[in-house]
């Protein structure tokens, strides 16, 4: 028989990216600002257990070989914190709200900030941790969440550091490692 090669990746090495989109139904009573607060730091840092990894860099202005290995295949492609786009000016938190059910009860959280995973365990952790975080936010909208000063910069900082020792700035003026953010959540 003929040899067949199957690739599961999230970027083509030429500046194009595609990923695994997730969708969550969230109680419409939870203000969208609270949804953003609940998930922003999580989406930036969950790559420590759910990133697919890749060799090289595709961040505009950086040489491909400037990063030998990174945690997430998609991190180099995010340019905005929040927005509607999915193919240009990609946001960490997408605002597309098409719940395909009763829109007076639920909103759709359309997630594009995630890698397609080969590992079933990574997929489980990615989806389950996000679902639990959203459920906690619905139960306690006043719950304190870690807030990053520059999430767009932080998502690439975290990805470009497979040692998990890089620190990112918080909104409060301190610094924290990605793994510490996940422990806080």
List the model feature ranges, each with a label.
Residues 5-7, 11-13, 18-179:
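Loop-rich catalytic cores of soluble enzymes, especially ATP-dependent carboxylate-amine ligases
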Residues 184-185:
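Long, low-complexity C-terminal extensions of enzymes
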């Amino acid at each position: 028989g003929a040899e067949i090669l199957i690739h599961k990746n999230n970027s083509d090495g030429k500046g194009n990216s595609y990923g695994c989109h997730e969708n969550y139904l969230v109680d419409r009573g939870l203000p969208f600002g609270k949804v953003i607060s609940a998930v922003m730091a999580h989406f930036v840092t969950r790559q420590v257990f759910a990133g697919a990894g890749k060799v090289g860099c595709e961040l505009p202005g950086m040489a491909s070989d400037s990063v030998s290995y990174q945690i997430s295949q998609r991190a180099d492609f995010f340019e905005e914190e929040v927005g509607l786009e999915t193919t240009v000016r990609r946001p960490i938190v997408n605002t597309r709200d098409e719940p395909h059910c009763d829109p007076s009860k639920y909103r759709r959280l359309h997630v594009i900030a995630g890698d397609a995973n080969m590992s079933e365990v990574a997929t489980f952790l990615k989806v389950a941790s996000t679902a639990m975080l959203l459920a906690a936010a619905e139960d306690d909208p006043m719950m304190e969440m870690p807030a990053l000063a520059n999430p767009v910069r932080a998502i690439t900082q975290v990805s470009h550091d497979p040692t998990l020792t890089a620190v990112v700035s918080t909104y409060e003026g301190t610094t924290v490692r990605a793994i510490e953010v996940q422990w806080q959540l």
